[in-house]
Amino acid sequence: GIPCGESCVFIPCISSVVGCSCKSKVCYRN
């Protein structure tokens, strides 16, 4: 549920390597 400061509209979350995932076009962690 914590925003990772990254969007995932056109590309996947680069921050997925630290546990972030795409939700509603924004990368979130927990």
UniProtKB/Swiss-Prot annotation:
Keywords: Disulfide bond, Plant defense
Cross-link (Cyclopeptide (Gly-Asn)): G1-N30
Cysteine pairings via disulfide bonds: C4-C20, C8-C22, C13-C27
Source domain of life: Eukaryota
Pfam family for this entry, one: Cyclotide
UniProt keyword Nucleotide-binding, yes or no: no
Matching InterPro entries: Cyclotide, Cyclotide_bracelet_CS, Cyclotide_sf
GO biological processes: defense response
Modified how: This is a cyclic peptide.
Known function: Probably participates in a plant defense mechanism.
Family: Belongs to the cyclotide family. Bracelet subfamily.
UniProt domain comment: The presence of a 'disulfide through disulfide knot' structurally defines this protein as a knottin.
Protein name: Cyclotide vdif-A
Organism encoding this protein: Viola diffusa
